[in-house]
């Protein structure tokens, strides 16, 4: 580790292979906590490259719980968090809209870190059992079309690093890589990130991970979701090409909605919002979900255009399919699935 620390002190970038090896060292129980803290802070001060992000992602996915990965066509729409906007659970609500549109969703997520309610907190409040094994997750993806992957359970080697991150209380590379460490072999992905200058590096990592299609967005107001407040900065990965662009919500018929208008609350309050959206209630929450789910359906390839994605998202809700997916996941995740273990 000392060699890597010296390079970082000198402001030098690590190669992908160096970062991969450093990542394995970070996960080693024999490494000193002071070394982990120094590495994370120095890397942050230097600025992370796509190669460094990918090298660490390789190490984390290698040490994650193993999956059979026989499920084809899975997608995730997990964002990085960390935008400080305290919005309701946009991506988790959108995940059921995607599932209702016949997209297999492997939703990677965690409890609240910088927000009041994380995806795990919301799903537990709704009645979903978030303690699923890899075999159970495969079963849920195949038979329900949506499954939740509780990040701490999927990545047990990260427990020590999580403690150090909390003690440091500053953003590190781990604030960026949550969506990139999903242990399921995804085909497509929709990623919201809070740092605009990392749009391209994250898209490049998704390309290295072999995604067929992906869309990375930094919303207006630096939201880690697509925002109805104004211009959204976007990077699209398709046919192995990366294109940078921007998207205005007005173009798709949405009224401007300030980010403050879509703030959430505790898990009970956010569960009420999610159920309202999935039940077809008209609101700024619904419009925000339609925009995000529409973009995700476009990123997935289920929709050929963003307009078509928004139409499919609305149908998923208004037909009752999105809510049905939630109810099915609640029932199936709470069954005893010994037959798949």
UniProtKB/Swiss-Prot annotation:
GO biological process per UniProt: L-tryptophan biosynthetic process
Residues recorded as binding Mg(2+) 1, renumbered to this chain, are 91, 225
Q: Name one GO molecular function term.
A: magnesium ion binding
List all disulphide bridges recorded for this chain.
none
Record bears the keyword Glycosyltransferase? yes
Q: Which UniProt keywords apply?
A: Amino-acid biosynthesis, Aromatic amino acid biosynthesis, Glycosyltransferase, Magnesium, Metal-binding, Transferase, Tryptophan biosynthesis
Q: Where does anthranilate 2 bind?
A: 165
Which residues take part in binding 5-phospho-alpha-D-ribose 1-diphosphate?
A: 79, 82-83, 87, 89-92, 107-115, 119
For Mg(2+) 2, which residues are the binding ones? 224-225
Q: Which Pfam families does the UniProt entry name for this protein?
A: Glycos_trans_3N, Glycos_transf_3
Q: Which reaction does this chain catalyze?
A: N-(5-phospho-beta-D-ribosyl)anthranilate + diphosphate = 5-phospho-alpha-D-ribose 1-diphosphate + anthranilate
- Give the protein's cofactors: Mg(2+)
Pathway(s) where this gene product acts: Amino-acid biosynthesis; L-tryptophan biosynthesis; L-tryptophan from chorismate: step 2/5
Gene Ontology CC entries for this record: cytosol
> Member of which family?
Belongs to the anthranilate phosphoribosyltransferase family.
- Tell me the protein's name: Anthranilate phosphoribosyltransferase
Identify the species of origin: Bacillus cereus (strain AH187)
Q: What is the lineage of its organism?
A: Bacteria, Bacillati, Bacillota, Bacilli, Bacillales
Q: Which gene encodes it?
A: trpD
């Amino acid at each position: 580790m000392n060699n890597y620390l010296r390079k970082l002190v000198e402001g030098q970038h690590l190669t992908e292979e160096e970062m991969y090896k450093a990542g394995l060292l970070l996960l080693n129980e024999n490494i000193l906590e002071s070394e982990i803290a120094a590495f994370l802070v120095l890397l942050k001060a230097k600025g992370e490259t796509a190669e460094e992000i990918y090298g660490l992602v390789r190490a984390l996915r290698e040490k994650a719980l193993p999956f059979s990965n026989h499920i084809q066509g899975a997608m995730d729409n997990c964002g990085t968090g960390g935008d400080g906007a305290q919005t309701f659970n946009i991506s988790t609500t959108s995940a059921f809209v995607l599932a209702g549109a016949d997209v297999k969703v492997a939703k990677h997520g965690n409890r609240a870190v910088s927000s009041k309610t994380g995806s795990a907190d919301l799903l537990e409040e709704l009645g979903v059992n978030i303690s699923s094994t890899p075999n159970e997750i495969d079963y849920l993806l195949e038979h329900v079309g949506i499954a939740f992957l509780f990040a701490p359970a999927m990545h047990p080697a990260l427990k020590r690093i999580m403690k150090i991150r909390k003690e440091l209380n500053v953003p590190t590379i781990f604030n960026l890589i949550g969506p990139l460490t999903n242990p399921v072999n995804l085909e497509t992905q929709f990623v919201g990130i809070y740092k605009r200058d990392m749009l391209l590096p994250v898209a490049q990592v998704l390309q290295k991970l072999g995604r067929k299609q992906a869309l990375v967005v930094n919303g207006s107001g630096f939201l880690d979701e697509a925002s109805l407040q104004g211009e959204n900065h976007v990077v699209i990965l398709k046919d192995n090409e990366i294109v940078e662009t921007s998207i205005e919500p007005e173009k798709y018929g949405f009224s401007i909605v300030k980010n403050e208008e879509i703030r959430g609350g505790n898990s009970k309050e956010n569960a009420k919002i999610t159920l309202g959206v999935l039940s077809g209630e008209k609101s700024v929450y619904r419009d925000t979900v339609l925009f995000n789910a529409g973009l995700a359906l476009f990123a997935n390839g289920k929709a050929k255009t963003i307009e078509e994605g928004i139409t499919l998202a609305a149908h998923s809700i208004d037909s009752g399919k999105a809510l049905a997916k939630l109810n099915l996941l609640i029932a199936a995740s709470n069954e005893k699935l010994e037959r798949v273990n």
